[in-house]
Each structure stands twice: as C-alpha cells, then as structure tokens.
C-alpha cells in the first residue's frame, strides 16, 4: 500500500507518514475468526518483566490465521483484504467452497475474487500453498514451515520473501530475507509469492505518542539512570560505562550474542547472514 505524508501543521506531523490502506476492502473483521487478546505489557505468568518497552496501546482482538494451509484440494475464494493490528502484513479472508472460512497472510498481488488452493497438486501461482518438493527452483516463497505439519514460522512479515535455491535429497535450500541460507525438509509447506504491504518499511512514526498507540514504551539509556536503577548509572555529569555493557540485571548487552551455541537447528544453516 502506498504511503502518504502531511503538511507540517505541527512538529509531529512534519515527518509522519501513514499507509493509505488502498488495498483494504473490508474494515470489520470476521467475528468467528476473532479471539480475545489480553494485554501482557511484557510480563510473564509471574507478573515479572521479561520484555522491556511494552505496555499500553490500543485494545486488540487476535485474528486466527491459518498458518498450516492443510485444507487440501478445496478451492477458496478471496472474500476481502483486511488490516491486522497484530502484524505488519495484511490478511486475506478466504471462503472455501465447502463453507469453511479462514484468514491467511495476504501475498503481494492477491485480488478479491481470486481463487486459491492448497495441496500437493496446486498450481504455482500467488497465494497457493504446497510442499516445497513440488515447487520449482527459483520461486519466491513466504509463510514457510520449519517442520512438516507444524505451521509456518519463516518469512511472515510485510514485504518478505525467500527464494528456493536448490533441492537435494530430503532437504531444500532457501535464501531467507536476512541473507541466511537455510535447509528445510522438502515436505514442509510454503506459499507462493511475496508477503504484501511492501511499503510498510517506509512508514515514519513521526511522534512519540504514535508509538504509545502501538503499545511501545520509551527506551531509556542506562547511563542516564541512577546507580540503583542500572549498572551503567550514576556519576557526576556524563561518564563512561566503566565495564563491559550489561542489561539492568547484569547480563551482557549491546552486541553480545544471545543465540545458543548448541542450538539444534545450527546444522540446517548453510551460510549465516552477513552483517548489516
């Protein structure tokens, strides 16, 4: 969807850009596909803070998205393209010919009235989902499973796409949006095409209050806190950290790697992503 700017009537409007929502065809969601979504504000089931800078924001309902696409050989008509407050991509409402309804991620180019289908015999066209073993090398994919039948976990955000680079034995090699080359099982399912809402990356929040509407709280540097609030805090005026950078709880921070060295999925990574 294109983005539009504003005349600088106020400092907050000067840099702000918003989506025009031209692709959205329906403004009210399908009630049968909604679920309650309680605000967690970054807390776990013990009430302890586990993710900083979250809280507030507008109330939301969760849209139940079909990430498995396992309703094989039943054609579905795209009834509408809708906004989803829980993700950067838009979603498409499908009406299956047997009466079932479902939401999927809306790929770029998907139109209302178009027919999509999933299954091993599906055609190679945008919106169809099928096992990777039945997809030609070089095809752009999104909504990709990491384990057969588990549901899609890779390439789900706006504008994302992976390219199928090779198929050898039981595994296929994909080039992910990060540049990482990764192997996945050829029985894993993927959807043809690129995730829609390509202009999402060009949206400028413009002002602090708009971040608060989205449930994002301010990020305060430890160096400007008091020593009882953060290990970097304290001192007269500005001071160097004086130690290796750490989180408020003393764990390594600011560039420290957090991925487990013995992560079981390491063996499926052919080439790590490059530095930005």
UniProtKB/Swiss-Prot annotation:
Q: Which UniProt keywords apply?
A: Ribonucleoprotein, Ribosomal protein, RNA-binding, rRNA-binding
- Identify the Pfam families for this entry: Ribosomal_L2 (PF00181), Ribosomal_L2_C (PF03947)
Give yes or no: UniProt keyword rRNA-binding: yes
The record ties this protein, via SMART domains, to: Ribosomal_L2 (SM01383), Ribosomal_L2_C (SM01382)
Where are the annotated segments for Disordered?
225-276
Tell me, what is one Gene Ontology molecular-function annotation carried by this entry? transferase activity
Quote the biased-composition stretches of kind Basic residues, using this chain's numbering. 257-276
Q: Which InterPro entries match?
A: NA-bd_OB-fold, Rib_uL2_dom2, Ribosomal_uL2, Ribosomal_uL2_bac/org-type, Ribosomal_uL2_C, Ribosomal_uL2_CS, Ribosomal_uL2_dom3, Ribosomal_uL2_RNA-bd_dom
- Function, in words: One of the primary rRNA binding proteins. Required for association of the 30S and 50S subunits to form the 70S ribosome, for tRNA binding and peptide bond formation. It has been suggested to have peptidyltransferase activity; this is somewhat controversial. Makes several contacts with the 16S rRNA in the 70S ribosome.
The protein here is known as: Large ribosomal subunit protein uL2
The gene behind this protein is rplB
């Amino acid at each position: 969807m294109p983005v539009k700017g504003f005349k600088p009537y106020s400092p907050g409007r000067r840099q702000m850009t918003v989506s025009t929502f031209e692709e959205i065809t329906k403004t009210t969601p399908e009630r049968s596909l909604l679920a309650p979504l309680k605000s967690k504000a970054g807390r776990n089931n013990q009430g302890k803070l586990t993710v900083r800078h979250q809280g507030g924001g507008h109330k939301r309902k969760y849209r139940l998205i079909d990430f498995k696409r396992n309703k094989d050989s039943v054609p579905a008509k795209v009834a509408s393209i809708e906004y989803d407050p829980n993700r950067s991509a838009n979603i498409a409402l499908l009406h299956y010919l047997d009466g079932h309804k479902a939401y999927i991620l809306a790929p770029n180019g998907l139109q209302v009235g178009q027919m999509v289908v999933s299954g091993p015999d599906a055609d190679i066209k945008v919106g169809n989902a099928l096992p990777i073993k039945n997809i030609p090398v070089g095809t752009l994919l999104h909504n990709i499973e990491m384990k057969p039948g588990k549901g899609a976990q890779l390439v789900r955000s706006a504008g994302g796409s992976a390219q199928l680079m090779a198929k050898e034995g039981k595994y296929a090699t994909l080039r992910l949006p990060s540049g990482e080359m990764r192997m996945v099982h050829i029985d894993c399912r993927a959807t043809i095409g690129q995730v829609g809402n390509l202009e999402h990356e060009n949206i400028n929040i413009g002002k602090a209050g708009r971040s608060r509407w989205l449930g994002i709280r301010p990020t305060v540097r430890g160096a400007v806190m008091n020593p009882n609030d953060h290990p970097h805090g304290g001192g007269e005026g500005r001071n160097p950290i004086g130690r290796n950078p750490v989180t408020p709880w003393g764990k390594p921070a600011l560039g420290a790697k957090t991925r487990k060295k013995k992560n079981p999925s390491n063996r499926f990574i052919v080439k790590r992503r490059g530095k930005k």
